[in-house]
């Protein structure tokens, strides 16, 4: 899945996908260890999907924490006006 598609999903959807990818990776590693896996490159593809998903989750978390930490200019102006006694 493309990274741009992942950024549009919610965190719950991403965490569900992450769990599925990790289960698939476990299965592929087990098959590889027992010499039942013919397409070994799939392990690398699933690892990359896991990395993309984790990156999308971390970016969403970072954006939400920044929005909570940094209020917008309008909010700052409103706070200054109310502290001076002026109200919109």
From Swiss-Prot:
Source organism superkingdom: Bacteria
GO biological process: translation
Gene name for this UniProt entry: rpmC
HAMAP family the record matches: Ribosomal_uL29 (MF_00374)
Protein name, per record: Large ribosomal subunit protein uL29
Membership in a protein family: Belongs to the universal ribosomal protein uL29 family.
Source organism of this protein record: Metamycoplasma arthritidis (strain 158L3-1)
Keyword Ribosomal protein: yes
Annotated Basic and acidic residues bias: 73-88
GO cellular component term of the entry, any: cytosolic large ribosomal subunit
